[in-house]
Design a protein with these regions (language model features):
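Single conserved hydrophobic/aromatic residue that forms the stacking wall/gate
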Residues: 1-8, 12
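Short, basic and Ser/Thr-rich N-terminal targeting/leader segments
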Residues: 4, 15-17, 46-47, 59-62, ...
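Conserved, structured C-terminal
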Residues: 5-7, 69-309
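Conserved phosphate/anionic-ligand binding catalytic regions in large, soluble enzymes, centered on
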Residues: 13-21, 153-157
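Short, conserved phosphate/pyrophosphate- and ester-handling motifs at nucleotide-, phospho-/glycolipid
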Residues: 14, 25, 115
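Residue-level detector of beta-strand structural context in well-folded domains
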Residues: 19, 51, 64-65, 259, ...
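Internal amphipathic helical hairpin motif
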Residues: 26-60, 117-145
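Well-ordered mid-protein domain cores that form the structural environment of catalytic cofactors
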Residues: 39-93
Length: 309
C-alpha cells in the first residue's frame, strides 16, 4: 500500500485473474454502446472508460473497463467473479454478423504498475508511455503477439496496466522488480489492492455493487449515458438504499463489512467495505444506508465497532 503512495516508490501486482474479452467487427462499437451503460460513442481509439453491464432492473451485473484498441477492436476487462456471466450475456445478445467475441481470460497476463514513480520506470521500458494521459493507451505490435499499455488503475495514484502474453508478462515482472537505483518497486497483492481502492473511494463489485444496486444508488451516475441515467431515475426516484463513503474521526480497530451505522439510537445502515488507512491510521470505507443523510456531517453518525460505538 505505502509503496504506491510514497514519493520514490511504486508497486507491481499480478491482475491476471481478471477477465479479458476481445470484441471486434464493423458493428462492435454500436453494439457495445447498446449493451453497456457508459457512452461508448465518445470513446476514441487509444482511450478507455469505466462502465457497467446492467440487468433489466438497472442493477449492476458487473463493472468493467473498456479499452478501444482500434476503430473496430475493443478489450473488455470484467471482474474475475463476473467474467462468465458477462461473456454469457454478451453471447446471448450477439448479433448475427459484424461483431466477434474472443474470451481470452486466463491466457493473457495483466500487470498493474502503480505508484508515484510508475511513469519514470515505465519510460525505461517503453519511452512512448510519457505521451499517455490518464485513461489513454497504445498497442505495441510484436513478432508473435501484441501488448497493450494503458495509463489506468484502481488505486487512486498514477499508474499503468499491461496486457500481454504469459512469456512476456513473466519477463516484464522480473525486470520491474530488479534494482533500478533510486526507484523502488515492490510486489503487492489483493490486500493492498483493497486498501488502496477503499482509501481512494473506489467501489468493489460484490461489496458496494451487485445486481440489486443501480449505479445511481452507488453514487456513480456520472458513468452513465444521459438517456440511461434519466431512465434509472424514473425507475427508482427515491434512490434508497444507497452507498456512501465514510471516514472515522477517531482511531479505532479496523471497520469491517457488516458493522452497523447509527444516527443516535437508530440503525441506518451497514458497512460494505472498511479498513484502516495506512496513511492516517483512521478507519475509512463504504456503507449502505437506508435513509437520507447529511453528507459531510461531522459527529452525527456512529459506527458500531466490536460492540462499541
Amino acid at each position: 500500500h505505502c509503496s504506491v503512495r510514497r514519493q520514490r516508490q511504486m508497486c507491481i501486482r499480478d491482475s491476471s485473474h481478471m477477465g479479458v474479452i476481445f470484441v471486434s467487427g464493423a458493428m462492435a462499437r454500436v453494439w457495445l454502446n447498446e449493451l453497456l451503460a457508459n457512452d461508448l460513442s465518445i470513446l476514441d481509439t487509444g482511450h478507455s472508460q469505466y462502465t457497467f453491464l446492467l440487468n433489466d432492473q438497472g442493477g449492476v451485473m458487473d463493472d468493467l473497463i473498456v479499452y478501444r484498441l482500434g476503430d473496430e477492436t475493443f478489450l473488455l476487462v470484467p471482474n474475475a467473479s463476473g467474467v462468465d456471466l458477462v461473456y454469457e450475456t454478451m453471447v446471448k445478445q450477439l448479433p448475427d454478423s459484424d461483431v466477434f467475441l474472443e474470451n481470452r481470460s486466463g491466457s493473457v497476463v495483466s500487470l498493474a504498475v502503480q505508484g508515484r514513480k510508475s511513469l519514470a520506470l515505465m519510460e525505461r521500458m517503453n519511452p512512448k508511455v510519457k505521451h499517455l494521459q490518464k485513461n489513454e493507451l497504445f498497442v505495441c505490435e510484436g513478432d508473435r503477439d501484441s501488448m497493450v499499455i494503458a495509463r489506468t488503475g484502481y488505486t487512486g495514484s498514477d499508474g499503468f496496466e499491461i496486457f500481454t502474453n504469459i512469456e512476456q508478462g513473466k519477463q516484464i515482472w522480473e525486470w520491474l522488480l530488479k534494482d533500478h537505483g533510486s526507484i523502488q518497486c515492490s510486489a503487492c497483492g489483493l490486500g493492498a489492492r483493497d486498501t488502496l481502492r477503499i482509501e481512494a473511494g473506489y467501489p468493489l463489485y460484490g461489496n458496494e455493487l451487485d445486481s440489486s444496486m443501480t449505479p445511481l444508488q452507488a453514487g456513480l451516475g456520472f458513468f452513465l449515458k444521459p438517456s440511461l441515467k434519466n431512465e434509472l431515475k424514473a425507475m427508482n426516484p427515491e434512490r434508497l438504499p444507497r452507498i456512501v463513503y465514510y471516514q472515522l474521526l477517531e482511531k479505532t480497530p479496523p471497520p469491517r463489512s457488516g458493522y452497523e451505522i447509527y444516527e443516535g439510537d437508530e440503525k441506518i445502515g451497514v458497512v460494505t467495505s472498511g479498513c484502516l488507512s495506512p496513511l492516517t491510521g483512521k478507519g475509512v470505507g463504504f456503507a449502505l444506508v437506508q435513509k437520507e443523510i447529511t453528507l459531510n456531517d461531522i459527529g452525527n453518525y456512529k459506527l458500531f465497532v466490536r460492540n462499541k460505538k
